[in-house]
From Swiss-Prot:
Lineage: Eukaryota, Metazoa, Chordata, Craniata, Vertebrata
Name of the protein in its database record: Intraflagellar transport protein 56
Gene Ontology molecular function: any one: intraciliary transport particle B binding
Keywords: Cell projection, Cilium, Protein transport, Repeat, TPR repeat, Transport
Pfam families to which the protein is assigned, alphabetical: ANAPC3
InterPro entries cross-referenced by the UniProt entry: TPR-like_helical_dom_sf (IPR011990), TTC26 (IPR030511)
PROSITE patterns found in the cross-reference section: TPR_REGION
Chief place where the protein resides: other
Entry's localization field: Cell projection, Cilium
UniProt organism field: Mus musculus (Mouse)
TPR repeats, residue ranges: 57-90, 92-125, 151-184, 468-501
Record's compositionally biased regions (Basic residues): 18-27
Subunit and partners: Component of the IFT complex B. Interacts with IFT46; the interaction is direct.
Summary of the function given for this chain in its UniProt record: Component of the intraflagellar transport (IFT) complex B required for transport of proteins in the motile cilium. Required for transport of specific ciliary cargo proteins related to motility, while it is neither required for IFT complex B assembly or motion nor for cilium assembly. Required for efficient coupling between the accumulation of GLI2 and GLI3 at the ciliary tips and their dissociation from the negative regulator SUFU. Plays a key role in maintaining the integrity of the IFT complex B and the proper ciliary localization of the IFT complex B components.
Length: 554
């Protein structure tokens, strides 16, 4: 939601400007228009004077100043560049030109112009922000030391804190300035932004309301309110908040329109992502991340990886997303390297002082231990925020696996059955773990029914192997024999015959012990006859002899 760019934005048409209504025949003074922040009127007056030959010395500088404050940075750039070419160029123009380059995302040019300007508070603030953009910590600290305890410098510092995810530090500065300057209403929006980033959406709404009472049509404030509604309620509630902004098609704030289009994609669950997000990837920082999330939801892991592989993460969200993408790619490719990278990213976020007590931080630690297969530790973290995700299918999917992996198959089965997503319920990991839970919980018939519902595939073959072996270990020989029988038909591997033979003998022993109905013997004989092994006749002869002696129909 920050108004910053990551690529140059020159070229194209200037934003449309509204015509001013005439209030009389008296020509207003430039000073009056500037004091009223009527920058459109000021430009009109300056252009008129230029046209009739009444141009003053700094006309182009004032036009550049007004265009800059209207957000028309391309026009400001044109005026300032022309001013630098004049013979008696005012040296102050260089810092104004540098600021314009900065807002157009032309950071190298901004730095070059900034160093040509005479030393000033504004120049130091500009170079401070450029050092942050270039990730130059040494320069950042040098310019930081030059900041003074004046409002402009402190606001600049708060902005850097925000961009470095130091939200509480930014809040402290804004609140301190607000104590003595209640008229600085916009600071409430900045405070609300910080609370939003800290996941305090209700607090963000309360602070934002102070500003919206005075400025009810603020684009940025209404957009933030919509984002809070999205987090607190749902996408429809958020979209309703944006309706007034969408209806206001005449708004000259083009970047806000890009922001709204971006957020609508998020509010609508990714609808229109491929049409809206790609052009915004280097304009709105979150656009790249949301496009990566879209690709992940479409199971296009490779495309997600291509989009994020060169991103140097600087925020917890970026580290987390890189971790998720590497984990998904590692599972898809069977790559230990990608899994290791994912585990390190998760550990970095979850172990950080700023994130260790947040839900995302604990999710990261759970993910880290999950990849390390340390499921007791996984459960420690998952249990700490379980109450927030009772109906969340993804959470339940991971929680059930961890429960089952630690031997608590009873609760694992219960949680698996809470999952509603058909996509997850058809996933082999879900089917195999649920089958294992059924078997361990002495419900082998339900595990067998899971197999019967599957189409013939490599996954169904793997599930058969699981049922055959796990049922055998648990002494559930009937379903073990059935599974080994199908495996033997599909693949004449001697091991499958040995498994079936052992399971059939196991059933016979259970019949002898009175723990299995005698009628089951008929099906056991049928399973044995389907095998061409020489040992079959000897086993069948013994079983038939017993059946005859005990008058069991076969």
């Amino acid at each position: 939601m920050m108004l910053s760019r990551a690529k140059p934005a020159v070229g194209g048409e200037s934003p449309h400007t509204d015509k001013r209504k005439k209030k009389g025949r008296k020509i207003p003074k430039l000073e009056d228009l500037l004091s009223q922040r009527d920058f459109t009127g000021a430009i009109t007056l300056l252009e008129f004077k230029r046209h009739v030959g009444e141009q003053e010395d700094d006309t182009n500088l004032w036009i550049g100043y007004c265009a800059f404050h209207l957000g028309d940075y391309k026009r400001a750039l044109e005026e300032y560049e022309n001013a630098t070419k004049e013979e008696n160029c005012n040296p102050e123009v260089w810092v104004n030109l540098a600021c314009t380059y900065f807002f157009l995302g032309m950071y190298k040019q901004a730095e070059a112009a900034g160093f040509k300007a005479p030393k000033s508070r504004l120049q130091n603030r500009l170079l401070f922000h450029l050092a942050h953009k270039f990730n130059d910590e040494k320069k950042l600290m040098n310019f930081h030391q030059n900041l003074q305890d004046i409002k402009e410098d402190q606001l600049s510092l708060a902005s850097i804190h925000y961009m470095r995810s130091h939200y509480q530090e930014a809040i402290d500065i804004y609140k301190r300035i607000l104590l003595d300057n209640r008229e600085y209403l916009a600071l409430n929006v900045y405070v609300a932004l910080c609370y939003y980033k800290l996941d305090y959406y209700d607090v963000s709404q309360e602070v934002l309301a102070v500003y919206l009472q005075q400025i009810p049509d603020s684009t940025i404030a209404l957009n933030l309110k919509a984002c809070n509604h999205f987090r607190l309620y749902n996408g429809k509630a958020a979209e309703a908040e944006l309706k007034s902004l969408m209806d206001n098609a005449s708004s000259p704030f083009e970047f806000a329109k890009e922001l709204i289009r971006h957020n609508l994609v998020v509010f609508r669950g990714g609808e229109g992502a491929l049409q809206v997000l790609p052009p915004l990837v280097d304009v709105i920082p979150e656009a790249r991340l949301n496009l990566v999330i879209y690709y992940l939801r479409q199971d296009d892991v490779q495309e997600a990886y291509n989009l994020i592989k060169d991103l140097e993460p600087t925020t917890p969200q970026e580290y987390i997303l890189k971790g998720v993408v590497n984990a998904a790619l590692g599972q898809e490719m069977g790559s230990r390297d990608h899994m290791k990278i994912a585990q390190q990213f998760f550990q970095l976020v979850g172990g950080s002082a700023s994130e260790c007590d947040t839900i995302p931080g604990r999710q990261c630690m759970a993910s880290c231990f999950f990849l390390l297969k340390q499921f007791d530790d996984v459960l420690i973290y998952l249990n700490s925020f379980k109450s927030y995700f009772y109906n969340d299918d993804i959470f339940n999917f991971n929680y059930a696996q961890a429960k089952a992996a630690t031997g608590n198959t009873s609760e694992g089965e219960e949680v698996f059955l809470l999952i509603q997503s058909e996509k997850l319920k058809n996933d082999y990991i879900y089917l195999s773990w649920l089958a294992r839970c059924y078997i361990m919980n002495k419900k082998p018939r339900l595990a067998w029914e899971l197999y019967l519902k599957m189409e013939t595939s490599g996954e169904s073959f793997s599930l058969l192997q699981l049922i055959a072996n796990d049922c055998y270990k648990m002494g559930q020989f009937y379903y073990s024999a059935k599974a080994f029988d199908v495996l033997e038909r599909l693949d004449p591997n001697p091991e499958y015959w040995e498994g079936k033979r052992g399971a059939c003998v196991g059933i016979f022993q259970m019949i002898l012990a009175g723990r299995e109905p005698k009628e089951t013997l008929r099906e056991v004989l049928h399973l044995l006859r389907s095998t061409g092994n020489t040992q079959v006749e000897y086993i069948i002869r013994i079983m038939k002899k017993w059946a005859k002696e005990n008058r069991v129909p076969i």
